[in-house]
Amino acid sequence: MARDFKIMNFTDERAYHNTAILIYLKAVKSVFEHADVTIGNSLNQGYYSYINLGGRQLTTSDIHKIRDKMEKIIAHDTEIVIEHDTAKHAAEKWRSLGYPEKAELFAERPEDETVDIAELHNYRNCMYTVMLPSSGCVNLFDLRPYRNGLLLRLPNALHNHTIPKYRDDDKLYEAYAECRRMRKYTGISYLADINREIRNGNADEIIRQSEWLQSRQLEEFAEKIVEEHKKVVLIAGPSSSGKTTTAKRICAEIERLTGSDPLYLGTDDYFVERGMTPLGPDGKPDFEGLGAVDLELFNQQMEDLLAGKEVDIPEFDFVNGTKVFGKRITRLKKNQVLVIEGIHSLNDVLTENIPREDKFKIYISPLTQIAVDRHNRLSTADARLLRRMVRDNQFRGYNAEATLEAWPKVRAGESVNIFPYSSSADVVFNSSTVYETNMLKTFAEPLLKAIPESSGQYAEAQRILMFMKYFDKIEATDAVPDNAILREFIGPRK
C-alpha cells in the first residue's frame, strides 16, 4: 500500500522529495490560485520555500491551510501520471503560464524531444527526475514557518524514514543569502541563464566572475581571522567539499595579510595505528569516526604548539597503517596562525584544550547556486556526488559504479561526524560555482552512461543522467585558475 512506503535508498529519497514538492505546489495553488512559489535551497532536513502573495505576509493561518490541503491530497492517494510532451509544445505552454525560465530551458532542446510532465489531479509541473506512483506514498512531512517563508521538512535515507529534530541554522541561511547576492551580481539565477551564456560564447567570463566572487569571500574570512587575532583556524565539511584547496587558499590569504605563512596540518596524520581503529556497526574498521583519531596526542601537540614549544608532527603512512615521526619537527612562530583541516575539525572534543575564543571555525560545502527553475534545483548532495565521481575516476582509478556503491556509507558517516557540528561554525563557505555542473557533466556523463543495466547502481545513474541532460557542457578551459576548487576534482590545466 502507498501509505506503507518507506525510503530505503537515495533514489527513493529523491523520488519522495520530488513527490512531496509536487504535492506542496499543488496545495499552494489550490489555496492561493495566483501565488508565485519558489522552492529554495535544502535547509534543516527540508526545503526553504518563499510564497509571493502579492505584497502581504504569509501567516500562520495560511500555513495551516496549506498543510491541511497537503494532508487531504495525500489521504486521497491520487495517482501521479507522467505525461509526455514535445519540448516545443512544453516551451510554448510554460511561456503562456508565466514561467519563462522553464520555457527557455525546453526551447533549447530539440523540438521533437520528449519531455516528462508530472500530473497530479489536474496540476502539472516538470520535476525532471524520478517520482513516486501516487500522492499517498508521501506519508510523513512537516511544514513550519521560517524567516519570510516556510520549511517543508521531509524524511531521508539516513534517518530510517524519520524527520530529525528541528534545529535552527542561521549561518547556513546566511550562506544561502550570499548565494542569492552572487546570482544577482552575475545575472544568473536559473539553468537557462547559464546555458544561454555558454551558447553565446561567454563561458570564460562566467568562470572569471564566479572565481572572483569566491576569492573575495575567502579574503573576507582571512581579514576577519587576522582582525580578531584568532590563533587556530578549523576547517571541516562533508566529502568533496573542496576542503584541501580551501584550506590552502585561506593560508595564502593570511600570509598576504600578515607576511607569515600559517602552519597547516590535517587530522588524517593523527590516525591511531591501524590495528587500533574502532570497528563500525558492520564489523569493519571505522576510519571516519572520532575514535580513529589519536585524540590524546593531537590535543597535547596542539597545546604545545600554542605554548611555543617544538613539536614532532607525525605523517601517517597509509600503506603500513602507522604514524611516522621525525619528518616534520616544528614550532609556531610569534603570531603565526595554525590552520587545521579534517572531518572532525568542528567537533570541540578534537580541540578541547584550545579556548573557544582562540578558534575560528569554517564549515565548507558546495551549496548549490544554480536552480534548474523556480521549483527545482540540484541538491547539495548531488553536487558533491558529481565532484567525487569525477575525482575518483581522475585520480583514484575508480569507475562511477564504485563511487555510487560507496556513497551511502560516506553520507551515513557525514550525518554522524560532520553535519551535527556545522551550526557551531563562525562562517559557512559555499565552495560551489554557478558553472561547475556544466563543466563536470563533460567528465561525469560518459562515466554514468557506462554503467550497465544489470548493475545495482543503474537506476541511480539514470536518475542523475535525467536531470543532467539539461545542462549544456563546458569543456575544461584555461579560464579555470590553477587554485580553483574545481581543479581538485577535474585536475590541472594541460
Give the residues covered by each predicted segment.
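Auxiliary tRNA-acceptor-end handling modules of aminoacyl-tRNA synthetases
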Residues: A2-A15, A27, D36-R216, F221, ...
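Hydrophobic anchor at the beta1->P-loop junction of P-loop NTPases
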Residues: V233-I235
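Walker A (P-loop) phosphate-binding loop of P-loop NTPases
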Residues: S240
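Conserved lysine of the Walker
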Residues: K243
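Hydrophobic positions on the alpha1 helix immediately C-terminal to the Walker A/P-loop
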Residues: T246-I250
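Post-Walker A helix-loop "phosphate-sensing" segment adjacent to the P-loop in P-loop NTPases
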Residues: A252-L263
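Conserved nucleotide-sensing/catalytic segment adjacent to the nucleotide-binding pocket
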Residues: L263-L265, V272-G321, V337
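Conserved NTP phosphate-binding and transfer environment spanning the P-loop NTPase/kinase superfamily
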Residues: T351-K494
